[in-house]
Amino acid sequence: MNFKQYSPEELKECSMIEVVHSVLGDKRQATTFNELVQEIAQVLGLSQEQVNAKLAQFYTDLNIDGRFINLGENRWGLRSWYPYEQIDEEILPQPKPKKKRKVEEDGFDDYIEEDEDDFDDADGNADEEDDVEDLDKVLEEEDGDDDDLDDLEEDEEDDFAEEELEYDETEEEEEEL
């Protein structure tokens, strides 16, 4: 787009985005943001104060408009110049492969729950009768524990009775004095 053919009034009606699009189209190469701003100011006849006032909105418009692409390092170009596959290659930095750490062996085998089941029953036959017998033994032991508790309670009662007698005897002796 040749800007010389437009009158100053017509140029003032053009948006900064339209001017950038035509400038990049004429140059046919990526340009830094600062160079684009300088060319816009020159074409539109804007002062530095006017450019500074519109700079934030211009940058936002440049990012939002789908016709432009940021190529990194503050360089801008037209999206139509780059096929989709090339955009990914040029824009995205290639990730560096991460170094793998060596895993130190602790010398212990990993615990496998399946192995535990193999040692539960030596003859290979897991009978429910064995489980019932084990439960019976546990219950018998618990019954025996109750007898022990009864014996303890009786002993404590006997001790208490003896202490009570001793106390009564001591009281009688004190009264006599």
UniProtKB/Swiss-Prot annotation:
**Which keywords fit this entry according to its UniProt record?**
DNA-directed RNA polymerase, Nucleotidyltransferase, Transcription, Transferase
PROSITE patterns (alphabetical): HTH_HARE (PS51913)
HTH HARE-type domain sequence ranges: 14-81
Region of interest: Disordered:
91-177
**Does the entry feature the keyword Transcription, yes or no?**
yes
Check the record and name the InterPro entries matching this protein: Asxl_HARE-HTH (IPR007759), RNAP_delta_N_dom_sf (IPR038087), RpoE (IPR029757)
Which Gene Ontology terms describe the biological processes this protein takes part in?
A: DNA-templated transcription; regulation of DNA-templated transcription
UniProt-listed HAMAP family? RNApol_bact_RpoE
Q: What does this protein do?
A: Participates in both the initiation and recycling phases of transcription. In the presence of the delta subunit, RNAP displays an increased specificity of transcription, a decreased affinity for nucleic acids, and an increased efficiency of RNA synthesis because of enhanced recycling.
What protein family is recorded? Belongs to the RpoE family.
Quaternary data: RNAP is composed of a core of 2 alpha, a beta and a beta' subunits. The core is associated with a delta subunit and one of several sigma factors.
Q: What is this protein called?
A: Probable DNA-directed RNA polymerase subunit delta
